[in-house]
Regions:
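Nucleic-acid substrate recognition interfaces
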Residues: 1-372
Length: 372
């Protein structure tokens, strides 16, 4: 079995908006309450409070006068919040680099909650999504869902600009057959053009955030000078949020189109396994890396390729793609200087464009890994 999610915009009425706000708040409160409980328990005797214990404590808490308001929220959404917390703790202890679970802030974190389909409590039909405690919510269904797809869960979210979305997860029987890999493409991450491929092509990435940076800074300055809580401040905050949302949507649209073009043309795409977090922390590269959305692009590539029985291959991040001559294999230590964009191989005399040569090496290494 395989999973696939579709994201649709939903249009709740005023009453449903209030119910969503209550659910967002309850889910956040449950997460923070038991995060604090887990921290104190661990500090006292180095033991963990399991999901089962947390769920029993929450059931008892709902019966008290102080926390009776939790009954107004979807009970499954509250349970899912506990599950997410439990998963976050397990991930931290398995791999500390993921970071310790943090308390959720009403201002810092986005409003969202997840609920699971049990006994038909969630349905999608005739342009409406039925949700527990919420009822029928109008939905803009821009694609047809195959009949064999089974609805498993829904994540409801609200953007800073006030729009509501439902990400619906479906389960279906995976019948994709792996294709014979004949056409290979290598991609080398490019700071300004997103990537250069092994054919020497680049996508001419527009740099949406960089283009909007001055306007964003101007509107952000206006917001910082306004009195917090005033009507004008709220209007300006919404304006800034919409600008950020526009940049995000432009980037996603571009990356979806680029990944689709590549997927349709090639059977196997080879990329470097880059440490994007380290690159984001770099003072010189942070904004550019974030604007490019390389991580998002590779995610799109991966699922699109897999849907067609194709492959995304990652070569090791320490593979010397830029230093190695793609013709004779000579390693040129001088290319460690990032300012060196073109070079001639001292051994075979081939003239190289740094990025294209790297992409060719990545493609060749990917082919070697596939055929090993």
């Amino acid at each position: 079995m395989a999973n696939r999610a579709y994201k649709f915009r939903i249009y709740p009425n005023d009453e449903q908006k209030i119910l969503f706000a209550k659910t967002f708040g309850c889910v956040r409160m449950v997460y923070n309450h038991w995060l604090d409980r887990k921290i104190r328990q661990y500090e006292e005797n180095k033991t963990n409070v399991t999901y089962t214990i947390c769920a029993k404590e929450m059931a008892a808490m709902k019966k008290t006068e102080e926390y009776r308001f939790l009954k107004e929220a979807d009970s499954i959404a509250l349970q899912q919040s506990l599950r997410h917390l439990d998963t976050a703790f397990q991930n931290f202890f398995k791999q500390p680099k993921t970071g310790f679970p943090r308390f959720k802030s009403k201002k810092r974190n986005k409003n969202s909650y997840s609920t699971v389909c049990i006994n038909g409590n969630i349905t999608l039909s005739n342009g409406y999504l039925k949700l527990p405690k919420i009822g029928q919510v109008r939905l803009k269904q821009h694609r047809i869902i195959p009949e064999e797809y089974s609805l498993r869960s829904v994540t409801v979210s609200q953007t800073p600009s006030g729009k509501y979305y439902a990400s619906i997860l479906f389960e279906y029987e995976d019948q994709v057959q792996e294709k014979e890999l004949q056409k290979f493409l290598g991609l080398d991450f490019s700071m300004h053009e997103l990537y250069r491929d092994s054919n020497g092509k680049e996508p001419a990435y527009p740099g949406f955030y960089r283009n909007a940076e001055k306007k964003l800074a101007r509107e952000q300055r206006k917001l910082s000078k306004m009195q917090k809580g005033s009507n004008n401040c709220n209007k300006q905050r919404l304006k800034v949020a919409k600008l950020h949302e526009k940049v995000s949507n432009q980037r996603k649209d571009f990356l979806h189109k680029q990944s689709r073009q590549i997927t349709n043309a090639y059977d196997c795409v080879c990329i470097e396994d880059l440490d994007m977090k380290a690159m984001l922390r770099s003072l010189n590269f942070g904004k550019t890396v974030s604007d490019n959305g390389w991580g998002m692009f590779t995610t799109f590539l991966k699922y699109k390729l897999e849907e067609q029985g194709k492959k995304l291959v990652k070569v090791g991040r320490f593979f010397a793609s830029s230093q190695t001559c793609s013709v004779c294999g000579y390693k040129n230590a001088k290319t460690k200087d990032l300012a060196l964009r073109e070079w001639d191989c001292p051994q075979c005399g081939t003239h190289h464009d740094r990025d294209v040569n790297a992409a060719v090496n990545i493609r060749n290494e990917g082919m070697r890994l596939v055929n090993a």
